Each structure stands twice: as structure tokens, then as C-alpha cells.
Amino acid sequence: MNLLKGRSAEEKDSIAASIQRALVDTLDVPEDDRWQLFSEYDAEDFRHTSGYLGMAYTDQLLIIEMTFLEGRSDELKKSLLAAINRNLVAAGVVGGDDVFVMITEIVRANLSFGKGLAQRALTS
């Protein structure tokens, strides 16, 4: 999650929980399968347009980058995007326009959870 510096620990907890809930509910990700990083930026390093495609962005903008193993359908990804937005808005940490999400998919051989193994390439 990329965001402007200044969010409280409680706000970051709400952001993390909202995204995790969407992953669990939409993609059946296990509750304890959590890999989340926050990158906070000073104002001079967090630059974005004020609006695009009908959105009006504020300094509360969250730029969320997600990396998945390839294979999930477009429908599942669209459902996830909607769930993330809905959960963050319901948590009161951001307005609906300020949720910018990018999903990148990688092949199974491009991920190691440790020990120098591509664990997901060993199974299908």
C-alpha cells in the first residue's frame, strides 16, 4: 500500500484488515495468509493527478499493488476490486475514488516463500 505519510497506526490496521477481508471473502485466501507492506511518502514524493476517468483524487489516495500467481479469472479480480473498495469505504479510512488498485500476475516459478524453492511451481 502506497500512501501519503500521516496515517495513524489504527488507520493502517483498518486498511490492512479491509484488504485482507476482501481477499478472504472473494478469493478464499486463508485468514493467516497475509503479506502486506506499507510504503509511506512525504508530500513531495507522493504525486498524483487530481482526477482521472471521472475520479476525484485527494491526499487520502491509496495506491495498492497486489501480486498474484496467474490463473484467476477476470470476474474474480473484478469482484476483488469491488470488495476492496467497499471494505475500505465502510471502514471510513478513504473515499471510494481514492482506492487505486493494480494487480500483477506472475508465473508459479517466479515466487519463493523461502528456502530457495519455488513451492507453487512444485504443485499445480
What are the functions of these language-model segments?
Residues 1-124:
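A domain-level signal for the structural core that forms small-molecule/cofactor-binding pockets
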